[in-house]
From Swiss-Prot:
Pfam families in the cross-refs: GCIP_N
Comp. bias intervals (Acidic residues): 201-215
Cytoplasm listed as a keyword: no
Designated name of the protein: Uncharacterized protein C22E12.18
Residue numbers bearing the Phosphoserine modification: S211
Amino acid sequence: MSDTMVKNQAEEDEIVKSLNNVLKIVVTARKCLDDMKPIELPSELVESPLSMLKDVATLIHQYTTKLSVAAKPPITRDALEKYANDMATTITPLIAAVQVFNAEKYGEIIQNRLKMYAERVLFGIEALLRSVSPKPLGYISEDWKTRGRLIDTGILWESCEKIEKLGSEGIVGYMLEEWDNFVSMLEDARSDLEDYKEGDDSNWDDFGSESEDDSKEAHSEEVFRSEEQIQLANSLLQKLNACKILFLSIKKRRIKNEYPNTFLGELFNAAKQTSDSIDDIVAQIQEDDENFENELDNFHRSARNLCKICISSAQEDSFTPWFSKWLENWEIVSQK
């Protein structure tokens, strides 16, 4: 072996050693995510606590980008080690952010979202370290084998952006975005139900078709709906319309920064349950499932609970009577 090869081999070994040191920090931090004690926010951030999230995510994004660029030929040991070590300095602030924004003080939405994004960031950093290393790195965990290896730098940077957005817009910004998704899914459910009522069975059982032509041929004939089925579909459409009005009203009147995070979290969870129950009930009617009545009861109950939260868990205002009236009408509609 020539002197040059020996020198290159030694340099690669030093790079691997340095990257393994950083990787150990990352893997250890990721294991801590599921069992962390809350800590207080640094005094200098009390006035704008969410800015901590934005600052941490921005730094991680910057350093991981620099490391990714440094790994392109010609690769130098100094550049790799410098940016890997710089990146390592962001791990502690990231974990601290998860500890600061705990569920007890800031609500489950921020805590759960932040933990999810932080885990993806850490997996992404691990993936980046492994990709730039000249030799395989250690610390291969079961989590890495099953989930981490599927994370790439694109997901890493997307997660950084999600944390930045959470830091910029807070829980309200996140909820408004998700709320639009709820309404969109509700619209899709209404559309599917209209198709069902008209006798169109396509679009919800085509995944196994060998070709588009096969699919069209299989569903070329409309399915006859009985009067009872049509009445049931119309009744459910009426309820979905009522739920859409409720969702839009909540978005306008209840998803505001003036409400505590605990209330907003309770509201979000109830909305998600209602949205999920809508998907379930429409799927049940399409498949003519015998469990339809149970799913229908669950749908009625989840929508009722969502409205009750708007009445009882928020400070009474001029719009509280509207929610009370909606609930009153829902009790009538849900009996049909």
